Amino acid sequence: MSNNQEGQSLEKLRSRIDGLDSELLKLLNERAKCVIKIGKIKQKEKKDVSVPLREKELLDRLRTVNKGPMTDAMAIYLFQQIIDTLKDLQK
């Protein structure tokens, strides 16, 4: 492949990543809205923000649906960061 072809391919891939990043952000914001609603329900019902069993179930489910190429450890790490970050919206 020539440098020009590689450059075009690189540009296309970067453009695709930009689009995916926008989609991810949209989905994360949708998830955040759900988290806020859950937080309001938990406050009303005087429940704890952190529910370790629910988090474990969520992460276990992600392990079963992960088809790669990310390893389960990578996916779990990313989702743990998302969970921990969005928990603040429930407070």
Cite the ranges covered by each PLM segment.
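Domain-level signature for soluble enzymes in the chorismate/prephenate branch of the shikimate pathway
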Residues: 1-91
